[in-house]
A protein has these predicted regions:
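Structural detector for internal amphipathic alpha-helices that build alpha-solenoid repeat scaffolds
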Residues: 1-6, 12-15, 22-37, 46-47, ...
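Alpha-solenoid HEAT/Armadillo-like helical repeat scaffolds in large eukaryotic proteins
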Residues: 12-16, 43-51, 75-83, 106-114, ...
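Ankyrin-repeat and related helical/solenoid repeat scaffolds used for protein-protein interactions
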Residues: 137-187
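Eukaryotic acidic, Ser/Thr-rich intrinsically disordered low-complexity regions
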Residues: 174-223
Length: 223
């Protein structure tokens, strides 16, 4: 392929990212990811913030992972501070896929407790990928402040994030079980049960946790 032909392909793909058809945008992102070019990075990041189609957003993220982190991190780290929730969420999602721990300082307490559930969930997933070993316990303590939040999907996402940290979460879950609000206690108990039995259904763990909370703290049942 000549340089002139490649330049035309890049121009066509960049234009395709703004096409009214999601299938055209999907192909454009695939093309860029297949033949990475630094000139496309800014447009990929920009498009992530506004792309309405989930499949296209996933392809945009994939295309970004195909470029060198030195090229993608600056733009993505800027997006996590955006006022647009989708920009924050998709940037965090992409950072979790890239897995470069230089991004860790950008995962702030504010993002981990973001008012938007999608942003918070993306932040939780990114955090457990990027966190240094020596900060895992502190991260568990911050994540525990979100126990009991939201509906099923949000709670399951938080449980999975906590479980990904391993047994360092046990003291944190114990504290939440002992002193948390009822919803947080239920969520903490269910998360610990899933940690010990990964094959257990989340709904079953929650129902069991509700029963435990209703009867009293673990160890008090039947007294």
């Amino acid at each position: 392929m000549t340089m002139a032909t490649h330049d035309k392909d890049v121009t066509r793909a960049l234009q395709g990212l703004e096409d009214g058809s999601s299938s055209v945008r999907l192909r454009a992102a695939l093309t860029i990811g297949t033949a990475p070019d630094p000139r496309c990075v800014d447009k990929l990041v920009e498009r992530c913030a506004i792309e309405p189609d989930f499949s296209v957003r996933e392809m945009l993220t994939w295309a970004l992972t195909r470029h060198a982190p030195d090229l993608t991190l600056p733009g993505l780290l800027g997006e996590v501070r955006s006022e647009r929730a989708q920009a924050r969420s998709q940037a965090l999602h992409t950072l979790s896929k890239i897995g470069d721990r230089r991004a860790w300082p950008a995962i702030t307490r504010e993002l981990l407790s973001d008012a938007d559930d999608e942003v918070a969930r993306s932040a939780w997933r990114a955090a457990v990928v990027l966190v240094p070993e020596e900060e895992r316990t502190e991260l568990a303590d911050v994540l525990a402040t979100q126990l009991g939040r939201g509906g099923r999907e949000t709670r399951l996402s938080l449980s999975r994030a906590l479980i990904a940290l391993g047994e360092v979460i046990l003291p944190t879950l114990g504290a939440a079980t002992a002193k948390g609000a009822p919803a947080a206690r239920q969520h903490a108990i269910a998360t610990e049960r899933l940690l010990h039995d990964p094959d257990a259904a989340f709904e079953f763990a929650i129902e069991e946790a509700k029963r435990v909370v209703a009867l009293g703290t673990p160890g008090q049942e039947g007294q």
